[in-house]
UniProtKB/Swiss-Prot annotation:
ATP binds at residues 79-86. NCBIfam families: tigrfam_recA. Signal peptide: none annotated. PANTHER family: MITOCHONDRIAL DNA REPAIR PROTEIN RECA HOMOLOG-RELATED, RECA. Disulfide bonds: none annotated. Can catalyze the hydrolysis of ATP in the presence of single-stranded DNA, the ATP-dependent uptake of single-stranded DNA by duplex DNA, and the ATP-dependent hybridization of homologous single-stranded DNAs. It interacts with LexA causing its activation and leading to its autocatalytic cleavage. Keywords: ATP-binding, Cytoplasm, DNA damage, DNA recombination, DNA repair, DNA-binding, Nucleotide-binding, SOS response. It comes from Synechococcus sp. (strain WH7803). CDD domains: RecA. Belongs to the RecA family. This is Protein RecA. It is found in: Cytoplasm. The lineage of its organism: Bacteria, Bacillati, Cyanobacteriota, Cyanophyceae, Synechococcales. It comes from the Bacteria.
Length: 382
């Protein structure tokens, strides 16, 4: 006769819901005792998991990023030369200092201009600046600043200038294949966890290089290997698309920023703004672009009007009017923000109301459908 064997059931199957909750609380308490408070938590109960942001200085870019640079995350800003990378980060430093925060600038390129930084609103007297000799020294300084939890933002300018010690101590022309990529990979593994715990935002500026032998696709790539691409929560691709001129005099550039990666908001949005030589990002220019798109300010020909009154002929004159009328500027900004909170999306340099976009799409769809029906009837009659 066959012998009946009783299968032993796992203890988890016989545990009641109340006992499961008790066991979970016990193990959570044990983990916190072993590894410290905050080592494990429920996502809904963790206030520090709610991502706060730092303004970029450009309202259009803030909207494209979902509020600004996320705190406690790694950000990479890359682009060609003279596209506005350093200017963008100096504005972020100024915003942090304006809120009473502490900022640090790791100048690996040894190219920081204090006079220009001060003109953008940076408090250079209280700005922490380091000009390291090697890439290892620079990244170790970043790690110690982050672990102190006393610094709100650290900017590294740039990844391409983080030269490994072995390359500096070697002879000119010696091959050091992959040394910078290995350095960045090790550094990102080490500092990313500390960045999240301290709430410090670390912005890496990066340069572009061309891949050799690429026939199809984009030949551009960033320096320092692939580690930074993976660890960065936000990656911004900034380009100069236009040179601003008054007659023959050049006074600024028009910059276009594409959000190539975003882990805290929808990616692939695009923002445009003006960067004025010696003054930085034109905040009033950003406001005027958004006010026009949201309908707060209207334009007929070259004239801009607000509440039915003409306020300026041409974009530059209208921006000048906003500078001379701060109360009206504040009112327009409030109205623009109210429009944006009602529901809108970033389209290139400004915003487009979702409802209007939906109506436009529906109208086009209906028109296309009627054309198809008319075509079918015509063919049937023939």
């Amino acid at each position: 006769m066959p012998v009946e064997v009783k299968s032993s059931q796992s203890s988890g199957g016989d545990v009641r819901p109340g006992e499961r909750d008790q066991a979970l609380n016990l193990v959570l308490g044990q983990i916190e005792r072993n590894f410290g408070k905050g080592s494990i938590m429920r996502l809904g109960d963790a206030s520090r998991m709610r991502v706060e942001t730092i303004s970029t200085g450009a309202l259009t870019l803030d909207l494209a990023l979902g509020g600004g640079y996320p705190k406690g995350r790694v950000v990479e800003v890359y682009g060609p030369e003279s596209s506005g990378k350093t200017t963008l980060t100096l504005h972020a430093i100024a915003e942090v200092q304006r809120r009473g925060g502490v900022a640090a600038f790791v100048d690996a390129e040894h190219a920081l201009d204090p006079v220009y930084a001060a003109s953008l609103g940076v408090d250079i007297e209280n700005l922490l600046v380091s000009q390291p000799d090697t890439g290892e020294m620079a990244l170790e300084i970043v790690d110690q600043l982050v672990r102190s939890a006393a610094v709100d933002i650290v900017v590294v300018d740039s990844v391409a200038a983080l030269t490994p010690r072995a390359e500096i101590e070697g002879e000119m022309g010696d091959l050091a294949v992959g040394s910078q990529a290995r350095l960045m990979s090790q550094a990102m593994r080490k500092i990313t966890g500390n960045i999240g715990k301290s709430g410090c935002t670390v912005i890496f500026l990066n340069q572009l290089r061309l891949k050799i032998g690429v026939t199809y696709g984009n030949p551009e790539t960033t320096t320092g290997g692939n580690a930074l691409k993976f660890y960065a929560s936000v990656r911004l691709d900034i380009r100069r698309i236009q040179t601003l001129k008054r007659g023959t005099e050049e006074y600024g550039i028009r910059a276009k920023v594409k959000v190539a990666k975003n882990k805290v908001a929808p990616p692939f949005r695009i923002a445009e703004f003006d960067i004025l030589f010696g003054r930085g990002i034109s905040t009033l220019g950003c406001l005027l672009d958004l006010a026009e798109e949201t309908g707060v300010v209207t334009r007929k020909g070259a004239w801009y009007s607000y509440e039915g009154d003409n306020i300026g002929q041409g974009r530059d004159n209208t921006i000048g009017w906003l500078e001379q009328n701060p109360e009206a500027k504040d009112t327009i900004e409030t109205l623009v923000r109210q429009k944006l909170t009602e529901g809108s999306e970033v389209t290139s340099n400004s915003m487009r109301p979702l409802a209007a976009a939906a109506r436009s799409a529906a109208t086009k769809s209906a028109a296309k459908g009627s054309e198809v029906q008319a075509d079918v009837k015509t063919k049937g009659a023939a």
